[in-house]
């Protein structure tokens, strides 16, 4: 039995209706998926492309950085603007990676101001160093009064002049010797210091030569005069005692005088 054309016509619209309904359902599911993907993060998250910085859905910005040789991230905090979060990331990168760090901003972030106590101490130390290095003020040189003499400049010379001088050497002595038949007499004369100092050297040499010659002459004539002097002394002694050797009585009386007398010696002493 062949189907009728009316039945085929009714089945075709039914199939088209089922296909359209299924396509509409699939399109609705795809629309819900796109809406959820568009709702992640803040509205300005795609506007700023800073490393380690992202925006929350309520508008705040957060920053975090990956530590070296670790898979974990270090939380840096929440900030009001994207620039503040980027500066926080740059500071952390400099501390962790040093000069190899990749920074978000071209210029390095400014360092925090020092506390007031350390700033005051640094200012005080700088002022003290400046005061210590500064030279003391110079005083003007006043002219010296004319009636004052700088005696201290001549102190070494004055001390040299006040040193005791050695005593002058004794004056030379002149000797004159004379010889006679019985005795030899020697006289010594000392001329005044002024004459001795002024006398030339030739006079002193002549006096010494003459004195030496006279002394040698006296020594040569002394043995000859000794015998004659002894004979003369014996003759004078005999004349004084009056003894001629003729009478024995006179000879005995002469012996009395020749003996030593101890009592007489006491009186002589």
UniProtKB/Swiss-Prot annotation:
MF term (GO), any: DNA-binding transcription factor activity
One Gene Ontology CC term in the entry: nucleus
Question: Key word Transcription regulation present in the record?
Answer: yes
One of its GO biological process terms is: response to stress
Q: Does the keyword ATP-binding apply?
A: no
Q: Main site of residence?
A: nucleus
* Region Disordered, annotated ranges: 1-53, 106-153
Q: Where is the composition biased (Pro residues)?
A: 107-117
Q: What PANTHER family does this protein's entry cite? A: DEHYDRATION-RESPONSIVE ELEMENT-BINDING PROTEIN 2C, ETHYLENE-RESPONSIVE TRANSCRIPTION FACTOR ABI4
| Protein name listed in UniProt | Ethylene-responsive transcription factor ABI4
Q: Which organism is this protein's natural source?
A: Oryza sativa subsp. japonica (Rice)
> Which gene specifies this protein's sequence?
ABI4
